[in-house]
């Protein structure tokens, strides 16, 4: 029924230089009396931790404050004006081929990843008229970089001559945590200025990438941008094309994983926020919800930055003074908007399923959901309409939200002029501000997987892992690492993990990168 996990892990990618992270050794699983562990947070990180612990025979309780699992990729039903019940979510997410550990989690319930659909291109448009694409760019570095430069309209011969090679070659050998030691002190924008990237390439390709962190590139750490270059472009041969779930997140991902957890005897408690943690003098921890206090042997904190700050503040005995102070300084990225629009007519047949944009006011990307999501496609076929989604990241906290929504729609009309004549049958607007912020100089404040208390581990996409991972893959990887740390204490085998190469891909590239030092 389910894929069986051996703990050894499989890369399942094309990159022969992908790096293995060995699992802690030990016996196969608990037999007899096993420890009780609470995992707090039912997003990707929490599900990964709960999955591995349960597979090893640990007694796991998973706490999630929302009605369903998935965290920031959750979904919920909503009824349209035509009476149709559809699934709303926080929008498009790209499942890149480099996400080895996230894909390994999904393979527990979908061994062939048939729930994911490949998108054929990753196009980028700028309001000035410039357009770029990654469909024809070679996947293997350094051919990928050379191909992008050769094919992109944003790079000319004059631009190449202006580039500062001493600053640029450091991107050829990105290592964690060294990249943070070198670049965490400057912004992504200042770093690109130092390299003297062409202005057009700066705004089109690299600003689009940096805003995927839900942050203004003027505030984003250059180390995160350099790591992103390495993961998606210069360090991996998996390429920049990606997959998307073929159905809404709950049906494609979380409902099967919820069932998998229950089969492995995980007590999944949704609609149950955790209020306080109190370490016990003799070992273990007391966890308090709205209606009870329960003792556990260990704890995985798999919360977003804001929820982690609040829980630690409400738990004065948790951790030590330095750890608590660093947690208190964690920042949350600015608000972002997801607008989903149900239109009375289709967009042009040649519009891509996903489009990254720059220079269109607040609009950062456009998705035509009925190109790839089954539920949206069925609605579009029945109504002869279309389902379009707009994202606007890093919105000023004091912005007029209605005005931002209206302006994003106006920019859609610029991007896809045929939508001007479309009638808006229904719309949903989701405003959220719960993604982690990776500000200049902020790396030292981010928690690691291990806390001062060996019975408490931390997971999430803001966690320092010492590995070249980001976004959803950082969440999944940190969840497995958090479980590994606990299993290692108990002498039980952990999960083997994979990452993109952990340094430059060849000795030549590494020697070139050394010139930047």
Swiss-Prot record:
Its cofactor is FAD. It is an enzyme of class 1 (oxidoreductase). The keyword Amino-acid biosynthesis does not apply. The keyword Oxidoreductase applies. Pathway: Carotenoid biosynthesis. Its EC number is 1.3.99.39. Disulfide bonds: none annotated. Pfam families: Amino_oxidase. One of its GO terms (biological process) is carotenoid biosynthetic process. It catalyses: a carotenoid beta-end derivative + 2 A = a carotenoid phi-end derivative + 2 AH2. One of its GO terms (molecular function) is oxidoreductase activity. FAD binds at residues 45, 64-65, 72, 99, 461, 472. Keywords: Carotenoid biosynthesis, FAD, Flavoprotein, Oxidoreductase. InterPro entries: Amino_oxidase, FAD/NAD-bd_sf, Zeta_carotene_desat/Oxidored. Residues 1-24 are annotated as: Disordered. Disruption phenotype: Deletion of the gene leads to accumulation of beta-carotene. Belongs to the carotenoid/retinoid oxidoreductase family. Involved in the biosynthesis of isorenieratene, a carotenoid with aromatic end groups. Catalyzes the introduction of two additional double bonds into each ionone ring of beta-carotene to produce isorenieratene. The reaction includes an intramolecular methyl transfer from position C1 to position C2 of the ring. This is Carotenoid phi-ring synthase. It comes from Streptomyces griseus.
């Amino acid at each position: 029924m389910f894929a069986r996990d051996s703990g050894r892990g499989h890369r399942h990618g094309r990159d022969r230089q992908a790096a293995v992270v060995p699992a802690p050794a030990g016996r196969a699983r608990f037999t007899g009396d096993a420890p009780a562990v609470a995992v707090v947070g039912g997003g990707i990180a929490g599900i990964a931790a709960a999955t591995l612990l349960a597979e090893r025979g640990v007694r796991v309780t998973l706490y999630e404050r929302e009605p369903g699992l998935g965290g920031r990729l959750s979904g919920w039903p909503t009824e349209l004006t035509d009476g149709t019940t559809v699934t709303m979510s926080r929008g498009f997410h790209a499942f890149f081929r480099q996400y080895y550990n996230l894909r390994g989690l999904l393979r527990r319930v979908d061994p062939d990843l048939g729930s994911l659909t490949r998108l054929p291109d990753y196009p980028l448009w700028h309001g000035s008229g410039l357009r770029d694409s990654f469909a024809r760019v070679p996947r293997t570095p350094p051919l990928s970089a050379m191909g992008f430069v050769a094919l992109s309209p944003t790079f000319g011969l004059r631009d190449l001559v202006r580039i500062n090679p001493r600053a640029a070659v450091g991107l050829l050998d990105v290592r964690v945590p060294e990249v943070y030691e070198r670049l965490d002190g400057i912004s992504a924008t200042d770093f690109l200025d130092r390299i003297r990237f062409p202005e057009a390439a700066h705004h089109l390709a690299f600003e689009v990438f940096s805003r995927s962190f839900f942050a203004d590139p003027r505030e984003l750490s250059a180390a995160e941008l350099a790591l992103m270059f390495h993961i998606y472009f210069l360090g991996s041969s998996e390429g920049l094309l990606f997959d998307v779930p073929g159905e809404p997140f709950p049906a494609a991902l979380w409902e099967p994983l919820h069932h998998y957890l229950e089969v492995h005897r995980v007590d999944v408690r949704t609609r149950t926020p955790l209020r306080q943690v109190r370490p016990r003098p003799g070992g273990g921890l007391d966890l308090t919800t709205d209606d009870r206090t329960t003792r556990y042997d260990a704890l995985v904190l798999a919360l977003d930055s804001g929820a982690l700050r609040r829980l630690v503040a409400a738990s004065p005995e948790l951790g030590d003074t330095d750890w608590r102070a660093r947690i208190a300084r964690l920042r949350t990225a600015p608000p972002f908007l997801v607008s989903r629009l149900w239109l009375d007519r289709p967009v042009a047949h040649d519009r891509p399923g996903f489009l990254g944009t720059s220079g269109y006011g607040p609009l950062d990307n456009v998705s035509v959901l009925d190109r790839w999501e089954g539920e949206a496609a069925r609605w579009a076929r029945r109504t002869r309409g279309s389902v379009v989604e707009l994202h606007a990241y890093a919105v000023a906290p004091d912005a007029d939200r209605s005005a931002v929504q209206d302006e994003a729609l106006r920019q859609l009309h610029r991007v896809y002029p045929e939508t001007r004549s479309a009638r808006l049958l229904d719309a949903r607007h989701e405003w959220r501000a719960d993604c982690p912020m990776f500000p200049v100089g902020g790396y030292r404040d981010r928690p690691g997987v291990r806390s001062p208390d060996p019975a408490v581990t931390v997971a999430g996409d803001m966690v320092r892992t010492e590995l070249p991972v980001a976004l959803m893959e950082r969440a999944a990887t940190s969840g497995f690492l958090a479980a590994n740390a606990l299993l290692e204490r108990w002498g039980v085998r952990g999960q083997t993990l994979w990452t993109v190469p952990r340094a430059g891909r060849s000795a030549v590239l590494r020697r070139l990168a050394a010139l930047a030092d």
